[in-house]
Amino acid sequence: MTALPRYSVFGNPVAHSKSPQIHQQFALQEGVDIEYERICADIGGFAQAVSTFFETGGCGANVTVPFKQEAFHLADEHSERALAAGAVNTLIPLKNGKLRGDNTDGIGLTNDITQVKNIAIEGKTILLLGAGGAVRGVIPVLKEHRPARIVIANRTRAKAEELAQLFGIEAVPMADVNGGFDIIINGTSGGLNGQIPDIPPDIFQNCALAYDMVYGCAAKPFLDFARQSGAKKTADGLGMLVGQAAASYALWRGFTPDIRPVIEYMKAM
């Protein structure tokens, strides 16, 4: 009996990951059977865990917190997106035994905004809240969509300035944000503790979309605040999660899943 193609997601913690359910839905669309497992790698043991997985026949892996930067250094070669982001969320085994690193987070975000939410990015003004790895990972792909302006706001200005200089965008301290933005994207993790970024409510007055990169309950504080402050449309990061997974699946298997039915399936779970 032929073994099924094996895929995985590495993280710590990783028990909460919805990636196995998402990728099984993609496999149903393709009409194939796959295995997809969660692997909780020890801090300090990520490289060995990845090596063991691929040496025993692994066909592809996703990488989540806190290993995306380590995965970048582990990969033997990188896509342009991964190089720009300085982080890897997708590992692809090559025929020569090496690993290629890619970053599909930005594709997941922009496909959700433009294809599922039907909001154009080109010519729009975008505010990014936060300056961590999640935000850094999506800036290169956002820029490809040619927005009129990208502003990054962070609690500590130095970190925002660092990303602004790296990517040729603007930076402001969180408390000094003013003016209207078409799209406001929250990349801070405060929602996990019920907190919202320290921003004035009037910045949402002309906001076509307020988007939180996390999904579920963790997105609720920010999205409620945005809605009450005048944002026309709000969305959590479930579509981004499914979108980045679909891009990874396509890199591994050469099959591009339709993300819309999978987003609806995950909402119903």
UniProtKB/Swiss-Prot annotation:
Pathway: Metabolic intermediate biosynthesis; chorismate biosynthesis; chorismate from D-erythrose 4-phosphate and phosphoenolpyruvate: step 4/7. GO terms for cellular component: cytosol. The active site is at K68. Coiled coil: none annotated. Shikimate binds at S17, K18, S19, T64, N89, D105, Y215. NADP(+) binds at E80, G130, A131, G132, G133, A134, N154, R155, T156, R157, A158, K159, M213, G237. It is an enzyme of class 1 (oxidoreductase). Involved in the biosynthesis of the chorismate, which leads to the biosynthesis of aromatic amino acids. Catalyzes the reversible NADPH linked reduction of 3-dehydroshikimate (DHSA) to yield shikimate (SA). Homodimer. This is Shikimate dehydrogenase (NADP(+)). The gene is aroE.
